[in-house]
Amino acid sequence: MLNIEQIKEIIPHRYPFLLVDKILEVDEGKRAVGIKNVSANEEFFNGHFPDYAVMPGVLIVEALAQVGAVAVLKKEENRGRLAFFAGIDNCRFKKQVRPGDQLRLEVEMTRVRGPIGKGKAIATVDGEIACEAEITFAIGDKKE
């Protein structure tokens, strides 16, 4: 298990754009499972929507991508590098995510060739699928 401080050592995201609270499982370079506790105090709820708060789908996908990045960047050869979100296919939103929900974020790498990879991503709330997608990422270095 990884806590928030350990996650911040792996991926560069910070508040308000760090969308993973903890990692429950990680199989380096292959798979990770994370948790996002969705609070009523999230900034995005101010405008999405003021009278009926729903987590934006793009942020659910971003949370999945961050969990995938942890899996990929935990691999020894990728430590200190960045995982860039490069694409999304077959994305479907099946359940609204509301304040008080706990998102379980699972990403499993399905194909990796050199610096490019694909993963199957599923976000669930109480065992029900909220979002599923195939995400593509690219491993790169920081440019000075």
UniProtKB/Swiss-Prot annotation:
Pfam family, one: FabA
Domain of life per record: Bacteria
Enzyme class, broadest EC rank: lyase
Compartment(s): Cytoplasm
Active site: H48
NCBIfam families attached to this UniProt entry: fabZ, PRK00006.1
Descriptive protein name: 3-hydroxyacyl-[acyl-carrier-protein] dehydratase FabZ
Gene expressing this chain: fabZ
